Amino acid sequence: FNPKEISINTKVIPMDVLLRRLKQGTLILNPDFQRNEVWTDVRKSQLIESILLEIPLPMFYVSADEEGRWTVVDGLQRISAFRDFILGATYMKSKRSEDEGLGIKLKGLEFLKNIEGLQMKKLPNNLSNRIMEAQFSLTVINPGTPDEVKRNIFKRINTGGVPLSSQEIRNALYGGKISSLLKRMSEMKSF
């Protein structure tokens, strides 16, 4: 690729922007080079606890397309944790506002044991506000940047958290239509 074709910028966004995009479907969590969601509810809860303790989180990386959609390049596990706690699976299916906030219950917390077992909707206002007002650093890979750059960024920064398997690294490096087909096939019951 031509390095002059790379167009990247960084911004700070609040939690409500991530949530709005999740609700709209303009934040894509499962590109062909990303692995599946692998975090347990305990790990997701500990991420929420980190926000409540105001511990800075690593940067998120997204790739923007011409229609304004963002595809997650790095940060799938973290954004999925936000979705599963703040919005919840029931809301994501029903899209009914009364179902929002009934996601996973916090568990396995290290410091804030007094809120174990609570869902977003049951948190005291000061804590739910802290979550909703959290801000994140986001790197946007702008439209026109070659796909190879997206895969390379994923490979370079994905060194923390749950280690990638050899197959996940191969998908990141050599992905494309065949990886997408293989991923769909692996999810079939006949496999």
Model-found features: residue ranges?
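Basic- and aromatic-enriched surface patches that contact anionic nucleotides/nucleic acids
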Residues: F1-V17, P31-F191
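Short connector loops/turns at beta-strand edges and beta->alpha or beta->beta junctions
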Residues: K23-Q24, P56
